[in-house]
Swiss-Prot record:
SUPFAM superfamilies: Class I glutamine amidotransferase-like, FGAM synthase PurL, linker domain, PurM C-terminal domain-like, PurM N-terminal domain-like, PurS-like. Phosphoribosylformylglycinamidine synthase involved in the purines biosynthetic pathway. Catalyzes the ATP-dependent conversion of formylglycinamide ribonucleotide (FGAR) and glutamine to yield formylglycinamidine ribonucleotide (FGAM) and glutamate. This is Phosphoribosylformylglycinamidine synthase. Pathway: Purine metabolism; IMP biosynthesis via de novo pathway; 5-amino-1-(5-phospho-D-ribosyl)imidazole from N(2)-formyl-N(1)-(5-phospho-D-ribosyl)glycinamide: step 1/2. InterPro entries: Class_I_gatase-like, FGAR-AT_N, FGAR-AT_PurM_N-like, PurL_large, PurL_linker, PurM-like_C_dom, PurM-like_C_sf, PurM-like_N_sf. It comes from Saccharomyces cerevisiae (strain ATCC 204508 / S288c).
């Protein structure tokens, strides 16, 4: 067996290199220690044969050629790095002041990258030649003369270079390749001797020591319970596996002990537990809830008739089955892992919540997501704000700035790669000093951050409940990724205050994500569910906190069974793990299932087709006993009666007292001017633009997103609600679902009940921007974050839960069927601590009648006499409360009087009014935006920003304090744009629902002739403030811009920021050279005969559903074809007239975006011949590729005739994944090339918006300038990015990737192949377009203009 070392491409772009130099310099307390840095990947190849043949070596080199090569011809340092890597030289061989640092996967492990790269190599014919391929990173660093770099590096300074959980660092010598590929011997089983011979130590002393060393977080009662079970009942010592499993299964994180505790407050025993009060909401309003509190997510009856659109299990033809599809809802938090390791912590937070939505009932599926973050003050270097506090942090916990740079990327990356659109969220910062009731200073803030991940999904009605029992003998299966020693003890670690435990235990508790694996698992679940009555899944759970130690026992416990397991059947990437580590690690992307032995072969076939790993690890038993055997070590790690594990350790009792903070009233005399207040408030992150958090996340995948965060022709992120269409199917469906968030944690410093009520009310005011069916249809998820053990916080928690469970929610008729709690929201280190306020995050979910009736803050320009109307639900209050407002926060105040819901009936009447306003035939409401963070002024400004217009804002006169109160109070309310002629109708509907005229007032009007914002004293008509829309919007966008500049390429951040000032920018537009209405007739004409199109996907592809639907709507028969189908002969391309390569992340973009997929075609003889014949020999075929499919086709250019000068698609100039709506033009070249295209016939010259979502879309011509020239001369570019003026552009963000000459789509000379980076298939439903002109829904029949592309192909076929 021979090992090879091959230098790879550049690992870091110049922008990333500059950032890394800056980071390492800062950690070494210098600005100029490092002069230069070069980077590359290293490929380690473990050969099977003694020596690879020359042909095999060349193939291997081709496979491992991707991204940008080192410039060894012109750069001496790059050449030195390449030679040192190729020859495996130590750092000392490079000369003085030059260091070579290598990072490789941790010894004895197999990385996810390795699994995918090895898989590609095997598909390409190297299965008998190459055992495994691994990848490392090499950094060549040149310092100033004489600086001892290695002496100044430590774990903290190197965290920007490697992940010590999964990787190893080599600072001087190169790693021995044997250590990379050699597996360690399994570690032994450990017994904890609770009955030692040394009688000086009691069993409790010994268990207490193990409790600390293992990070079990057991309380005294639980330790007594375990001692009784093992010492007194079983009369034996427990194993470390049994103790660790018990700790995870019974942790606060998993069992919610505080919410089930008995409470005594101020000496009075309380009548209800917290959970009982939450359940009360469901008890009083159970309508439309199918499942609550009993599964991984709550299941709702949406009452929306829809289609189950999926491939037929036999023919693989995409078919529509008409059925009502229940909605499932879930919101999770991943706070502790995000504090420790922000990127993987947030990534696995989203991944875990996605699995919850996939493991509901007997198999389900996520549909769309949300994410949110609360952190302490950002302290952006060079952009520190006057109210921000810098109080330090524990050394091993990430700063707020690092969290907000890395964590959103982690969450977005997982969602993107899995294929889940993220269309809602929030972002808040807080660090403030307050005095407790004794006058002692406390720091309140989010050093322990909140990372929230949630969303909703769907489940077929027959599988909504876990009502098919697992029976004795059922196969117990682990589906998904192989286990590794990561995420150990996450359930227990997240149940204690951060910073209290050991840094090593904290770090060990963070999982790592592999979204492409989770996508494969979801495909398995989808295929099982598509079998209908033959679904082999009896029951399913996701593997989360506690790993298999929680999931597998829970699976059988649900069915009152026991189980017997073989621990060595658990698939592992790390054979050296001990039994405890195998059983308890929290490796991600895993599900546990029960499958009948008779159905095992069906399940196995599905997994094989999807390349999803699985193992039968045990069987259910009638005896309620949990036995885990280890045949390798010949031990029994677990032998427990199920009641011991799931029995009843002593029920928790909580005693607390009511203690209010000592808060002074608001002091507005400290505020120098209205201008200063506006400037500061616009810079507060909770108020300002969240664009930097949104553009990194795909918001168009599935083709069902009818309202995302960005609004209008100028794409400003101000939407109140996220909305999806119900389903794809035979026809356009107008129904849908909505979700919206509400959270008011700062108010909890003043009043817990007010904070809770405001959070619910805010979520409702947001969700009612959508055409919600009724209040009873709305269901809430409540996520409670509390430092429950902090003095006075227990009573606040009880007060808040009581306010919702026994008061507001019953009064409104809304239920809370799902939720989560995190009860350790405190960070401690040294002699410092930062305590979070009680934070209730409410997410409202509801079915929607008509998604096209969703209101947005975009002001309607087609009316001359509209006014802006405020409905102020606090109108009867003599004074407005400024407590906990953004205004006070930016002047380091909290205040002592909070807004609240003063009258439940008025709020309910207002919400009923919104339902009726939506139902009016005439659009009475032209625009809508609720009043929230920042108050009335921010509500109005956001409407102006979205609309690129001016405003005249009228407020009552008075002094500065009066002006500040009117403009910045955050009392409940909303602003409506109403035409003057409809004002009386609007008022009448509100009055009839109990909202009297005193609640309604005109506060201004829009000005579409100017972009000046004026605030006018309505008493004197004096202008008391004036500024331009562009300057105010830039101030509002400043935090987002600064974060984007730190995280992404600063040049593109600056270009986008500058574009805000272009007052003449006309925005998105539809300048079409064809009439989309004609396509309705074409669709009917072509639907009788349906030629077959292969909807082609490789592992990791996620955009097949919307692609299949578009071809179906165009008159084709769409067939689900995987690469394994072609490799194994289940399908042949001869069977199809068309081929559509779908978007996603094939092989997780390992070996380059689309490259692994393409190489599996080019270097597999049988498959290559199929594709070659399809492109070259047949004249009746066409091929289309979008995004990843475009990258795939572009790399097949050698077998597509005339396409040798096609570009490749490389990393975006922004160095970031970009999800945007961009304008493109269908090229109208001198040779009329677009008219030759099978797809673009009749569209030439059209300019229109399209969805974009990719990280590697820059068209790059690597051979020479002549390649680009020849490409353009041959007319092979058929789609180009244009700016809003219609000019071809390379400017960001109008060109989202920096593509040369604006290249967005390319075609073959014969017009039969089209490859494009944007996504037409995602916007063929008109509502899936973020914006379209008024009146087009009826005119175009619900279809978007891009449906023409697919119907043109159908006409070409004839």
């Amino acid at each position: 067996m021979t090992d090879y070392i091959l230098p790879g491409p550049k690992a870091l772009s110049q922008f990333r290199v500059d950032n890394l130099i800056k980071d390492i310099n800062s950690y070494t307390n210098s600005t100029s220690v490092i002069n230069e840095l070069r980077s590359c990947y290293i490929h380690y190849v473990n050969g099977i044969a003694q020596n690879l043949s020359e042909q095999d070596t060349k193939l291997l080199e081709v496979l491992l050629t991707y991204d940008s090569a080192l410039d060894i011809a012109n750069d001496p340092l790059a050449r030195q790095l390449n030679d040192a890597v190729a020859n495996n030289l130590p750092s000392s061989a490079l000369g003085e002041d030059t260091y070579l640092i290598r990072v490789v996967p941790r010894s004895g492990t197999i990385s996810p990258w390795s699994s995918k790269a090895t898989n590609i190599a095997h598909v390409c014919g190297l299965q008998d030649k190459v055992q495994r391929i691994e990848r490392g990173l090499a950094l060549l660093i040149k310092t100033v003369p004489g600086f001892p770099l290695l002496e100044n590096l430590n774990d903290i300074s190197l965290k920007c270079v490697y992940d010590r959980m999964t990787q190893q660092l080599y600072l001087t010598e190169p790693p021995n390749t044997m250590s990379i590929f050699t597996h360690e011997e399994p570690k032994p089983l450990v017994h904890v001797p609770l009955t030692p011979k040394d009688t000086k130590q009691s069993p409790k002393d010994i268990l207490s020591k193990a409790n600390t060393e293992l990070g079990l977080a057991l309380d005294s009662g639980e330790m007594e319970y375990l001692i009784h079970a093992f010492v007194e009942t079983m009369k034996r010592d427990p194993t470390d596996v049994e103790l660790f499993m018990f700790a995870q299964v019974n942790s606060e994180h998993c069992r919610h002990k505080i919410f089930n505790a008995d409470w005594t407050i101020d000496g009075i025993k309380q009548q209800f537990t917290l959970f009982q009060m939450i359940r009360n909401t469901h008890k009083l309003n159970p309508e439309y809830t199918i499942s609550a509190y009993s599964d991984n997510a709550a299941v709702l009856d949406s009452e929306n008739d829809a289609f189950f659109f999926a491939p037929n299990s036999t023919t693989k033809e995409w078919t529509s089955t008409k059925e009502r599809i229940p909605l499932l809802i879930k919101v999770e938090t991943h706070n502790h892992p995000t504090a420790v390791s922000p990127f993987p912590g947030a990534a696995t937070g989203s991944g875990g919540e996605i699995r919850d939505e996939g493991a509901t009932g007997r198999g389900s599926k996520t549909k769309c997501g949300l994410s949110g973050f609360s952190v302490s003050d950002l302290l952006i270097p060079g952009n520190e704000q006057p109210w921000e506090l810098n109080i330090g942090k524990p050394y091993h916990i990430a700063s707020a700035l690092d969290i907000m740079i890395e964590a959103p990327l982690g969450s977005a990356a997982f969602n993107n790669e899995f294929g889940r659109p993220c269309i809602n969220g929030y972002f808040r910062t807080l660090t403030t000093k307050v005095l407790n009731h004794q006058g002692k200073e406390e720091i309140r803030g989010f050093h322990k951050p909140i990372m929230i991940a949630g969303g909703f999904g769907t489940v077929r009605p027959q599988f909504a409940l876990k009502n098919t029992p697992i029976t004795p003998g059922s196969c117990l299966i682990v589906l998904g990724g192989q286990s590794m020693l990561i995420g150990l003890g996450g359930g227990a670690a997240s149940s204690v205050a951060s910073g209290e435990g050991s840094a090593d235990l904290d770090f060990a508790s963070v999982q790592r994500g592999n979204p492409e694996m989770e996508r494969r698992c979801q495909q398995v679940i989808d295929a099982c569910v598509a079998l209908g009555n033959n679904n082999p899944i009896q029951s399913i759970h996701d593997v989360g906190a506690g790993g298999l130690s929680n999931a597998l026992p829970e699976l059988v416990h649900d069915n009152d069974l026991g189980a017997k397991f073989d621990i060595r059947k658990v698939l592992s990437l790390e054979p050296g793990m001990s039994p405890m580590e195998i059983w308890c690690n929290e490796s991600q992307e895993r599900y546990v299932l029960g499958v009948s032995p008779q159905d095992l072969s069906i399940f196995e076939e599905i997994c094989k087709r999807e390349r999803a790993p699985f193992a039968v690890v045990g069987h259910a038993t009638a005896e309620q006993k949990l036995i885990v055997e280890d045949p390798l070590l010949k031990t029994t790690p677990i032998d427990l009666e199920m009641p011991i594990l799931f029995g009843k350790p002593p029920k928790m009792s909580r005693e607390t007292i009511t203690e209010a903070l000592n808060l002074p009233e608001a002091n507005l005399s400290e505020i120098p001017s209205l201008q200063d207040a506006i400037q500061r408030v616009l810079n507060l992150p909770s108020v300002g633009s969240k664009s930097f958090l949104i553009t990194i996340g795909d918001r168009s995948v599935t083709g069902l997103i009818d309202r995302d965060q960005f609004v209008g022709p100028w794409q400003v992120p101000v939407a109140d609600v996220g909305v999806t269409g119900t389903s794809l199917g035979e026809t356009i469906i107008s129904t849908g679902e909505a979700m919206a968030m509400g959270e008011k944690p700062v108010n909890a410093l003043i009043s817990a009940s007010a904070s809770a009520k405001l959070s619910v009310a805010e979520s409702l005011l947001n969700i009612f921007a959508a055409d919600v069916k009724s209040l009873n249809h709305i269901k809430l998820s409540a996520n409670w974050m509390s430092p429950a053990s902090h003095q006075g916080e227990g009573s606040k928690l009880y007060e808040a839960v009581q306010a919702l469970g026994l008061d507001l929610c019953p009064a409104l008729g809304v239920a809370i069927p799902v939720g989560k709690d995190s009860m350790s929201m405190k960070m401690k280190w040294d002699d410092k601590e930062v305590t979070a306020p009680l934070s209730l995050n409410i997410t409202a979910f509801a079915p929607v009648f008509n998604t096209s009736k969703t209101w947005t803050p975009l002001l309607n320009r087609n009316t001359d006499d509209s006014v802006l109307v405020l409905v102020d639900l606090s109108a009867k209050q003599e004074t407005k409360s400024l407590g906990a407002s953004a205004l006070l926060q930016v002047y380091n105040q909290v205040g002592n009087k909070s807004p609240t819901v003063y009258d439940n009936a008025i709020l309910k009447g207002f919400l009923e009014s919104l339902i009726q306003l939506h139902q009016q035939k005439e659009d009475i409401v032209l625009a809508y935006h609720d009043r929230s963070d920042g108050g009335l002024l921010i509500t109005l400004l956001e409407m102006a920003f979205a609309s690129r217009c001016g405003l005249e804002i009228n407020i009552d006169g008075g002094d500065l304090e009066s002006q500040l109160t009117n403009l910045f109070n955050e009392e409940l309310g909303a602003v409506f744009q109403i035409s003057a002629k409809n004002l009386s109708k609007f008022e009448k509907i509100l009055n009839e629902n109990g909202v009297a005229k005193e609640y309604i007032s005109i506060v201004g009007k829009p000005s579409f002739q100017s972009q000046e914002i004026k605030i006018i004293n309505s008493t004197t008509n004096d202008v008391i403030y004036a500024n331009s829309r562009s300057e105010l919007e830039q101030t509002w966008s400043k935090t987002s811009y600064e974060m984007q500049k730190l995280r992404d390429n600063p040049k593109t951040a600056e270009e986008e920021f500058a574009s805000i000032t272009d007052d003449r920018d006309p925005g998105l537009q539809y300048a079409l050279t064809y009439n989309p209405a004609d396509d309705m007739k074409i669709g009917l004409e072509l639907s009788s005969q349906r030629p077959k199109v292969a909807i082609l996907r490789e592992q990791g592809v996620n955009g097949q559903m919307e692609m299949a639907w578009c071809f179906q709507q165009a008159g084709f028969n769409s067939v689900d074809v995987t690469m394994t189908d072609l490799l194994e002969g289940r399908f042949h391309l001869d069977d199809f007239i068309g081929l559509a390569a779908c978007g996603g992340f094939s092989y997780g973009d390992v070996l380059g975006a689309g490259a692994g997929w393409a190489k599996s075609v080019l270097y597999h003889e049988g498959v290559r011949s199929q594709f070659s014949k399809f492109f070259n020999e047949r004249q009746d075929t066409f091929a289309f590729g979008a995004c990843n499919g475009c990258q795939f086709l572009s790399r097949l250019k050698d077998i597509i005739p005339g396409c040798e000068n096609w570009p490749s698609f490389e990393r975006n100039v922004s160095e970031q994944y970009e999800a945007r709506v961009c304008m493109v033009q269908i090229s109208q070249e001198k040779d009329n090339s677009s008219e030759e295209s099978v797809f673009l016939n009749g569209m030439a010259g059209s300019k229109l918006p399209i969805a974009v979502a990719h990280g590697e879309g820059k068209a790059t011509f690597s051979k020479s300038a002549e390649q680009l020239e020849k490409f353009e001369k041959d007319g092979l570019c058929c789609i180009r990015y244009v700016d809003n003026y219609g000019n071809v552009t390379e400017r960001f963000p109008f060109n989202p990737n920096g593509s040369t000459n604006g290249i967005a789509g390319i075609k073959s000379p014969n017009g039969r192949v089209l490859a494009m980076m944007p996504h037409p298939e995602r916007v063929c439903r008109l509502e899936a377009n973020s914006w379209y002109p008024e009146g087009k829904y009826e005119e175009w029949g619900g279809y978007g203009p891009w449906i023409r592309l697919f119907r043109s192909a159908r006409r070409w076929v004839g």
